[in-house]
Amino acid sequence: MGYVVYKFEMLEKFCNEAFHKIGFSVEESKIISDVLLLSDLFGIESHGMQRLVRYHKGIEKGLIKLDAKPEVIFDTPVSAVIDAKDGMGQLVGHKAMEIAIEKAKQSGVGIVTVKNSNHYGIAGYYAKMASDAGLIGFSATNSEAIMVPTFGRLAMIGSNPIAMAAPAEPYPFFFDASTTVVTRGKLEMYNKMDKPLPEGWALDKDGHDSTDAPDVLKNIVAKNGGGIMPLGGSKEQSGSHKGYGWGMVCEFFCSILSQGLTSNKVNQGNKSGTCHSFMAINPAFFGSPEDIKAHFSTFLKELRESPKAEGQERIYTHGEKEVAATKDRKENDNRWRKFSLPLWKER
């Protein structure tokens, strides 16, 4: 399999121009591109530029509306609900977190939920927006059902990622993870590379372990049974109920509070209906932001310097690898996202 190496600036230019030619404004194209490129810079390739073709298809099919005008349908000093009107997820997500940040600066906390949206990229992008503003950020989203509940055999819940970011030194704390073992995007990458799935990731239509990526993806689309396991696998003994439960926590904050579509109804027919949740918390409402940041930074340092397991060189804290990956992929072209041509082939 051949690889093509790209400079970051080339990908940035391509991504912006592609979305602009599709029909988005220059400003909108930049927001969408920023979300995708941050994902690739952080090493989350499943949600990076490989999504561009999928978004284009969504627009062609009418799932994503270029002319959507998201509307705030409920508003208080600390909360809001937005109807995205089937618009691009990154655009409404960016706006929703901006609103949450402004409310948090004024009232201590801002919580915004969104319904009738589309895929919005990585949840961590929006949590990072709040952290970059000196606040504590949280974001989550539901998605088309891919998680099979514990003891079940039909996907009923999305990958339902949850992200949190907070200021710290020498780099911000950044956590972003799905509540499934892996995301659908990871399965798609294995499918496009003709690689079998690792054991413990997915289930077939009868609820048995499967390493067949094409079959699992086909069953997810057809709602024919099977899907991806919750964090913890498929058994309670390994903690399956915990990933299942976290998926439900995400679902509550996204689709229930917004009164939108639950994961098992997302992407039905000609509508996505994805729901998101955003939260910004102002640390100044709990004391000195600098003191809180210093206290957190001290604990993170203690974690990194705690005793290591035999054979291990270091202990990481969340956000450390993302910062290192970003620096590496911007400065060293040969280590930039290894886009391979098969990643773009159709299935």
Identify what each model region corresponds to.
Residues G2-L11, L257, K265-R347:
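Catalytic-core signal marking the mid-to-C-terminal active-site face
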Residues I73-S79, D83, H94-G110, S210-G232:
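Residues forming anionic-ligand binding surfaces in small-molecule and nucleic-acid pockets
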Residues M147-V221:
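Phosphate/diphosphate-binding glycine-rich loops and adjacent basic-rich segments that engage nucleotide
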Residues G2-F8, K13-I32, L37-L38, S46, ...:
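Acidic, glycine/proline-rich low-complexity segments that act as flexible tails and inter-domain linkers
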Residues P196-K265:
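Secondary-shell segments that build the walls of catalytic and ion/ligand-binding clefts
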Residues G48-I101:
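Active-site cofactor/substrate anionic-group-binding motifs, chiefly glycine-
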